[in-house]
Amino acid sequence: MESIKILRQNPEWLESAVCWFHQKWKVPVEAYRESMRICVENVKAIPQWYIVADSQQRLVAGAGVIENDFHDRPDLSPNVCALFVEEKFRKKGIARYILNFIRKDLGSMGIETLYLVTDHTDFYEKCGWRFLTMVHDKEGFAERMYCASTYQ
């Protein structure tokens, strides 16, 4: 398995990461660029971005940690967001590896709990996340909020 690149330690990957996440999630390029720029320039824990590249240096997986993933509970923060693994790299443990890496990295920064919204409930429960509550997105639709302790 390829190793995880922490964007704050690998700023040369910023533009590639911006384009890759935009392609996967259709969030505006500028929103990703701003968040990743803050990640690279800032010494604070949030936001953070993580990427995985294959042997040809193509991005194949990644995730971020932001204050709020477009829901109505700003008190449930920070949020893991945008976890994605390219189809041909799935079922190899990469997503679980990224999630555990994030839990360790954020734990080392003093963050105790992480949150995320998802409809992939079985996967996250198998990864040690637990259902916390329902939240609502910007359009008012209910979403399941999960939480997990970091590794400190």
Residue map of PLM features:
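A short beta-loop-alpha structural element at the N-terminal edge
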Residues: 1-17
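Active-site rim helix/loop that mediates acceptor-substrate recognition in acyltransferases
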Residues: 26-51
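Residue-level detector of beta-strand face positions
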Residues: 51-52, 115
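Helix-adjacent hinge/juxtasegments
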Residues: 69-77, 81-82, 92-94
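Conserved beta-strand in the GNAT
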Residues: 51, 58-68, 79, 84
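Conserved acetyl-CoA-binding loop-helix of GNAT-fold acetyltransferases
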Residues: 82-85, 91-104
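Conserved active-site alpha-helix within GNAT-family acetyltransferase domains
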Residues: 108, 112, 118-142
